[in-house]
UniProtKB/Swiss-Prot annotation:
The keyword Cytoplasm does not apply. This is Putative ankyrin repeat protein R580. InterPro entries: Ankyrin_rpt-contain_sf. It comes from the Viruses. Keywords: ANK repeat, Repeat. SUPFAM superfamilies: Ankyrin repeat. It comes from Acanthamoeba polyphaga mimivirus (APMV). The keyword Membrane does not apply. ANK repeats lie at residues 12-41, 189-218, 249-278, 336-365, 367-393, 394-423.
Length: 468
């Protein structure tokens, strides 16, 4: 008695003629029971375009596991047929029902098997729309496969076109989306695509859609203003009245223009007649390369920020030192300086922080010992100490937090500057245990830490931190 199996391989580890597996090849083949799967099933479920399928006759006493565990058992089998997937004639003798043909075509699309697709695309049972949806959704499918499918059926219903175009845009298959739109120029599809292109900052696609009749609105233009894309904005404004844009969305427009951080964008819309006032400082992108020149334009127009605003706080931690120098000259109130100093130190912009201190910011403005506003890290603590931060007010709080969170380098520099900590015994036990486990692997088994007093634990922690 005997039975039939299929062997599937996709590489050079297996010799289909002699049924021999090279070293390491055992894990690169599949052995399929023919009673469970037909040949076409094996192809669709297990094969790639580069695969081959060997139909073998196997003695009844051999199982699949025995064949995989000991490749020498394959010598007891007989090759009945070999099917190479890259040989198009393999499929000629197959009986392909409607559902099977559909599955095979999906397999061909996913494997970029262009010749096989061409063989069957004229079949009346093939739905090009379904194959396109399958191909577009799979990032491994090449554009030339999708273009082939489109060449067989260019025209779709409006809802079908919208679905395919949306899929293309989500998968960033822009050229295929353009082709679909050119063949199926439904106004609703074009307009919805422009919504997507604008929100996704796809300038090239947006221009294509405008050229193909898309209706432009304020939101489309605002999207490209926000990213500083002046070319696309000007192109759209050739088809949309500038004054209408200014009148319809003045507040959103001013915010978008200044948030773009683009000098050219700001100058362009000021020249168009956009009205501006001191509120533009709230929207300005302070980390832009153009910020310095933008501020000079505002100064030339005698537009200044309010002295009690958050402008300095919002800008100081991200702007260049040159921009900061201009802002400081606006004479903000003391609270603005102090809040800006906190945000700048916490952001690690220490040069800017030094300039704020030089200009009048107070590093000790917060005299509440239970509320330190600064982040705990070594560079920040060092900066505070170097600039006469009052450790008597906040030092103990910062040291406690440093120890409890394992910031031992911060704790060390604070201890070196005379700061004492104030913690409960349970907190001291946790700190000591964590330190020992981190730096020594374990606590000395001969030491009963629970029997130690708080003072004894403090001394041990001091010694460990200083000698770390």
């Amino acid at each position: 008695m005997s039975k039939t199996y299929y062997i599937i391989s996709t590489n050079d580890y297996f010799d289909p003629i002699n049924l021999s597996i090279k070293d390491g090849g055992e894990k690169t083949i599949d052995i399929i029971d023919c009673e469970r799967y037909t040949l076409i099933d094996c192809i669709i479920f297990f094969c790639k375009k580069e695969s081959f399928v060997i139909e073998i006759i196997v003695p009844d006493f051999l199982t699949k596991d025995k064949l995989l565990c000991d490749s020498e058992n394959l010598s007891l089998c007989v090759v009945n047929n070999i099917y190479y997937m890259n040989d198009i004639s393999v499929f000629d003798s197959m009986s392909l029902e409607k559902s099977t043909l559909k599955s095979l075509m999906n397999w061909a699309v996913k494997n970029n098997y262009k010749v096989l697709l061409q063989k069957y695309l004229d079949n009346q049972n093939i739905k090009i729309y379904d194959l396109l949806a399958c191909g577009i959704s799979n990032s491994n499918v090449c554009d030339n496969i999708l273009e082939l499918l489109l060449s067989y059926c260019k025209y779709f219903q409006e809802n079908e076109t919208m679905f395919l175009v949306s899929f293309c845009l989500e998968m960033h298959r822009i050229d295929i989306a353009k082709t679909l739109i050119m063949y199926n120029s439904y106004p609703s599809v074009i307009n919805k695509s422009l919504n997507f292109a604008s929100k996704s900052n796809m300038s090239e696609l947006a221009i294509f859609l405008v050229d193909n009749g898309a209706e432009i609105n304020c939101d489309h233009i605002l999207c490209f203003i926000r990213i500083g894309d002046i070319d696309t904005v000007l192109y759209m404004l050739c088809r949309y009245d500038v004054q209408k844009l200014i009148d319809r969305c003045h507040f959103d427009l001013v915010e978008a223009v200044f948030n773009s951080g683009s000098l050219e964008m700001i100058e362009t819309f000021i020249d168009f007649g956009m009205k501006i006032n001191s509120k533009v400082y709230q929207h300005l992108k302070y980390d832009s390369k153009d910020t310095y020149e933008i501020l000079r334009i505002l100064l030339a127009r005698e537009i200044y920020p309010r002295k009690c605003s958050d402008v300095l706080k919002n800008a100081a931690h991200i702007c260049s030192i040159d921009v900061l120098k201009i802002l400081v000259d606006f004479e903000f109130n003391q609270k603005s300086f102090d809040n800006a100093l906190v945000s700048t130190i916490n952001a690690g912009k220490f040069k800017n922080a030094e300039y704020l201190l030089f200009s009048g910011a107070n590093i000790n403005f917060n005299n509440m010992p239970t509320n330190c506003m600064f982040k705990i890290n070594f560079q920040t603590i060092k900066f505070l100490i170097d600039n006469n931060f009052d450790l008597e007010i906040h030092g103990t709080l910062i040291l406690n937090k440093s120890l409890l969170n394992g910031y031992y380098d911060c704790a060390n520099i604070l201890i070196e500057n005379g700061v004492k900590f104030s913690l409960t015994k349970s907190e001291l036990l946790k700190i000591y245990s964590d330190f020992q486990n981190t730096h020594h692997g374990q606590i000395d088994p001969e030491l009963n830490i629970n029997s130690l007093t708080s003072d004894e634990l403090e001394n041990l922690i001091y010694i460990d931190i200083v000698n770390k």
